[in-house]
Regions:
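Acidic, proline/glycine-rich low-complexity IDRs
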Residues: 1-67, 71-75, 81-209
């Protein structure tokens, strides 16, 4: 049994991304499709959103075990969003953001409960010379919730979008010393946080450094 969007569902996701995140200039189509077909959409920066966004299109075909306050409204599917600095040019399918998105988006095939708010995934397998981050934290897409909280599929299920918040070592230390909830509350005014080679830990601003 496989999990796949039909053409109409793909169009609905792409329309949502184009409207709320930026024009889709390119798409990375998955080469080997087995249990699920998950493409990556690249939304270009806009004046209102000065970063490039990498968005999955296909993970939402996999039903998730989301909290009851979501599932009771038939919100039981999700797509992932990773923001990148506008200067970031994705040159290869082997670039760590692309490999990371493909890896995370397939986790629900083994465990439908892994994709959840405030879940943290360490990036040991994705550490490279151009990757200063040590983990990512999932969070319900704040800007999406303010604008339009979900995509309604023809099958009646609803798809939400979850941001990947890239965590620098100091930020991961802050979470381990406090909690993911406290970190998110303290840095909320800085969201969304994009993957940026020059970004300094937001915890520096919290501590007044």
């Amino acid at each position: 049994m496989g999990y796949f969007y039909d053409t109409t569902e793909k169009i609905l996701i792409e329309q949502y991304v184009s409207e709320h995140m930026g024009e889709i200039k390119s798409k990375i189509t998955e080469e080997a499709v087995f249990e699920a077909g998950i493409d990556l959409l690249i939304a270009e920066p806009t004046p209102e959103r000065p970063f490039r966004s990498l968005v999955t299109c296909g993970m939402g075909a996999i039903p998730l075990e989301l909290p009851q306050y979501l599932s009771m409204h038939r919100i039981n599917r999700a797509e992932l969003v990773l923001h990148l600095s506008p200067e970031w040019q994705l040159k290869s399918r082997l670039d760590w953001p692309i490999r990371l998105m493909h890896w995370l988006s397939r986790l629900p095939l083994d465990d439908a409960s892994l994709i959840r708010d405030l879940a943290i995934f360490e990036l040991d397998a994705f550490l490279e010379h151009d990757n200063p981050y040590r983990a990512v934290m999932l969070h319900y897409c704040n800007e999406c919730h303010l604008l339009d909280p979900f995509v309604r599929l023809p099958r009646k299920d609803r798809v939400i979008f979850m941001e990947l918040i890239p965590l620098l070592p100091a930020e991961l230390d802050y979470i381990e010393a406090h909690s993911a909830e406290e970190f998110l509350r303290d840095v909320h005014r800085f969201l969304p946080l994009a993957a940026d080679q020059t970004r300094q830990p937001v915890t520096k601003q919290l501590s007044g450094e």
